[in-house]
Amino acid sequence: SAASDVYKRQYIKIGMELFYAEGPQIVKIIKSLGHKIFLDLKLHDIPNTVKKSIKVLTAFGIDMLNVHSSGGIKMMKYATEGVIEACNEYNLRKPTLIGVTQLTSTDQNMLRDELMIDADINDVVLSYAKNAHISGLDGVVCSALESNIIHGSISSDFLTITPGIRLNGDDKGDQKRVVTPRKARELGSDYIVVGRSITKANDPLLSYEKCINEFLSLIHI
């Protein structure tokens, strides 16, 4: 069913803080428990460095990993090559490779005043997404608010992975462009990334189940 398919697609996200504190061993531990892993390190460097780093990370058996789309097409193409080379060398299934567009902590004023980008934030995100698609990536990390325009302009098969998810009543924290799990589904998100609404909740398991149920509620089973 559609519901069981979504449950099978769930990942444990390992971010910078956990990976830098515990190292590659944490990947092995979580994989040994049967979970799929989204390694969220947002690689952004010169193309050769990103390619070599991606090869190392792919060899860990990661299921999803990302780079910064602002690194440019050449960097993203090298990342794609690194994934393919590692999979061929170690006989691994190809992980999902995605590009970060604009962080959900970025708003229009910050884009203009601090990053010196005068374009509309939606146009910037779409441009980065198109570059990621050209480079062979499987999708992008973006706000749920941008999912529909990305699917419409690129492809419905091009994945949108959307952080900035909060349950109703939760503190937004440092996120600027936030939506609920239900709204993310309405806007066409393929995956949602949920952190503090679960980890900082009084009952994390209950909040986790609320997020899942909200996101699944618009799927016709």
Feature locations, PLM:
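Glycine-rich phosphate-binding active-site loops on the catalytic face of alpha/beta enzymes
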Residues: 66-72, 181, 187-207
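Conserved anion-binding
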Residues: 49-53, 60-135, 146, 157, ...
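Hydrophobic faces of well-ordered beta-strands that scaffold small-molecule active sites
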Residues: 12-14, 37-41, 65-67, 97-101, ...
